[in-house]
């Protein structure tokens, strides 16, 4: 299949099926909300609805003692949650308790757990909801650092738009601080919450942390393919500028590149103009540049982690395949597509061979790679930095702008502005703890001291 090919009827049907399933999931959400009831509706007759909360220092045996005491009063459990944060335990149970046993159960819990230094609260309320609120969205906040002021401002913005924070937990302490917030947004319909998204985008630029928000649910965990731009995304350089340096025309080429990435010039025309500057260079220069490439910090970790999870990973670049192929082999990527420099008699001619990999071709390449691997577009992720990546990010299920030009940030689903590629993992809900556990098991774990 070439970049201009279109999906088959079976592929189109699969896409329609996915859309139907997504609609059904949305309808199911509303149906669940309609049938949500109180604890009093869910427990047997003669039982009082109670929310039992225990807090204090975490010690071995606390949980066992808690449930042993509840079991002696034949308590009916509806929901339980326990968490430990820096040595402090919080344990809560939503339960049905025989009315005549409420006082003795409370006294028994306090007597038993006071020896562990735990406090006990029992709230009896027939109007307690029997089911947890179902979060509609997930927000990831990334910064270096993230401060209380940042979270206060984010929380106030959410409150101003009627959104509620259901939970917060840390997902990263290196190389950035990352927090994941589960939210309930009033308008949870597809396409809803647009004013909130705009307000958060403005807040991001004002306070200097990255904020990404997407719908909660299975689709967030269903991603199976990731496609990276190369120059200034997967690697730290613009390859054509590295080549131009050997021709003594780096500044001239860099100026054209900058205008093209901002969307001020047609990419294909600008590419031809820049490649002309390379005419006459010895082909060995291409190999030298390939050896000099430096990956963006976090690139190896990101690709290694996603490959462990079964992702297909690859690159689509407006750069040159002769430089990218060695990198793709080293990183064990599943696909790579880029322009081909014409070389005649060991010299660059100043031309490229075949169709230019431009904005449209990048998006078509993503589609082709997805279809060839049996992966639907809503299961894809694309990461890029320039106007040339707009169509690719718009096509992907999740488009991530990485230290990007404004034109790309405006259309991306999420934007990150720290030069560390493993932020992509945090946006996908993968925690630093999970990454490093896997690295420890296979001997690849390392933390490089951060500067600045």
Mark where each language-model region is.
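A conserved regulatory-domain signal marking ACT and ACT-like small-molecule sensing domains
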Residues: 2-13, 20-223
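Short glycine/serine/threonine-rich phosphate/pyrophosphate-binding segments
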Residues: 62-63, 150-152, 234-237, 389-392
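Long, charged amphipathic helices and adjacent flexible linkers at domain junctions
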Residues: 124-130, 211, 215-224, 257-283, ...
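Active-site neighborhood of HAD-like aspartate-dependent phosphohydrolases
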Residues: 222-268
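C-terminal cap/substrate-recognition subdomain and adjoining C-terminal extension
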Residues: 280-398, 402-452
